[in-house]
């Protein structure tokens, strides 16, 4: 199996759309002043938005969403608007994928990421 990867540059519009679709209107995802008041650099992308993109890449690598059985990851870093993250999946043995999500600075934003498929 070849390596599958997708590069995504996060935008305020994308983060807002995810907030509306998911119902997660936590102000750290929508209000820069609030986010800074709690020690964040500003608005950050939802972890589950990132995981959803990673799951999409894993599904493609597994041969379709119906083949994906499990996906694991740890939310390890913040993604801010303007950050570009490369999400990737590659073979890790029969029915297993190693997954990565790395920003433009080379920092892993999702770690301990893997998937199982049938």
Spans of features found by a protein language model:
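Hydrophobic beta-strand-centered segment that forms part of the acyl-chain substrate-binding groove
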Residues: 37-45, 49-96
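HotDog/MaoC-like acyl-thioester-processing domains
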Residues: 1-6, 79-118
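Catalytic strand-loop segment that frames the active site of acyl-thioester-processing enzymes
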Residues: 1-43
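Homeobox/homeodomain signature
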Residues: 5-8, 18, 24, 34, ...
């Amino acid at each position: 199996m070849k390596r599958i990867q997708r590069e995504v540059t996060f935008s305020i519009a994308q983060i807002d759309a995810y907030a509306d679709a998911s119902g997660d209107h936590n102000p750290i995802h929508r209000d820069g002043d609030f986010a800074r008041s709690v020690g964040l650099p500003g608005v950050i992308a939802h972890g589950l938005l990132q995981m959803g993109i990673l799951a999409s890449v894993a599904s493609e690598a597994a041969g379709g969403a119906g083949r994906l059985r499990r996906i694991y990851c740890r939310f390890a870093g913040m993604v801010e608007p303007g950050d570009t993250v490369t999400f990737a999946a590659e073979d890790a043995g029969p029915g297993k994928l190693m997954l990565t999500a790395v920003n433009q600075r080379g920092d892993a934003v999702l770690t301990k990421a893997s998937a199982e498929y049938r």
